[in-house]
Design a protein with these regions (language model features):
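Conserved glycine-rich cofactor-binding loop
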Residues: 15-16
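Conserved glycine-rich Rossmann-like NAD(P)H-binding loop of the short-chain dehydrogenase/reductase
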Residues: 29-45
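Conserved mid-core segment of classical short-chain dehydrogenase/reductases
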Residues: 69, 90-103, 146-149, 188
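Amphipathic alpha-helical dimer-interface segment in Rossmann-like NAD(P)H-dependent oxidoreductases
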Residues: 73, 77, 101, 109-129, ...
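Catalytic Tyr-X3-Lys loop
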Residues: 90, 97-116, 133, 157
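Active-site helix of classical SDR
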Residues: 118, 153-154
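Residue(s) in the substrate-gating loop at a strand-loop-helix junction
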Residues: 137
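C-terminal helical subdomain
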Residues: 177, 197-235
């Protein structure tokens, strides 16, 4: 695995949907992407699609500390990590009384993974010259019916993001909170008990969304867009 002098980005949840588009568009702009996902079959496909000089797949659970640390050690061997995009997460849409412990554990994997990948990358970079973008949801900005556990997780992610901003204010570590609304991916398409098919056309295209996010994240301007709130059009 070689980065060939390219800027290095880590994208968690890179196999499908928004994560895939973020990885694809970064690679198109000349980045080397370390993609993290539990979908081994899809990860193998992406290594073939992008090539070893642009993409390295790491297959595992983002909330597994041993996996995180081993992966970061390998990635750091290539050079300084410039960008970490914590994108991985899983949904759980149910009425409040229908939730079980397994649903809570599933949602919390995203929060735990965000923390572990941030900590490990910060350590590897010596807490310098790093941008961390935490992709959450508009569910981190309000409470939604039938999303109580999901919202609780996203609010936790927002709290972590805000705390990182406070800790690294005035340094070369930049923290960005990303809050997108509904995206037209399997994340919602597989949840038609909650999201009606009639509303699906109003959800955001992941390629367009990734372009908007990266336009704000990756540029040569002497500024940082600290929060990116992106709502879908409801028509």
């Amino acid at each position: 695995m070689q980065s060939n002098g390219k800027r290095i980005a880590i994208v968690t949840g890179s196999a499908l949907g928004l994560g895939y588009e973020l990885a694809r568009q970064l690679i198109a702009e000349g980045w080397f992407v370390a993609g993290v996902d539990f979908n081994a079959e899809r990860q193998a496909e992406l290594e073939g699609e992008f090539g070893a000089g642009s993409y390295k797949a790491f297959v595992g659970d983002v909330s597994d500390e041993a996996f995180v640390n081993a992966s970061i050690a390998e990635i750091a061997g290539l050079g300084h990590v410039d960008l970490l995009i914590n994108n991985a997460g899983q949904p759980s849409f149910k009425t409040p009384a229908a939730y079980e412990a397994a649903d809570v554990d599933k949602c919390l994997k995203g929060l735990k993974g965000m923390i572990l990948w941030s900590v490990a990358t910060l350590r590897a970079d010596g807490e310098t010259d790093l941008k961390i973008a935490n992709v959450m949801s508009t569910a981190a900005t309000r409470g939604n019916a039938n999303e109580s556990v999901y919202c609780a997780t996203k609010w936790g992610e927002k709290g972590y993001t805000q705390s990182l901003k406070a800790a690294y204010k005035g340094t070369s570590v930049k923290i960005v909170g990303v809050y997108p609304g509904g995206i037209d991916t399997a994340f919602y398409r597989d949840s038609h008990d909650y999201v009606s098919e009639e509303k699906q056309h109003t959800f955001m295209d992941p390629a367009q969304l990734a372009g908007v996010i990266l336009f704000n994240l990756v540029n040569d301007a002497n500024l940082t867009v600290s929060d990116i709130l992106i709502e879908r059009n409801y028509v």
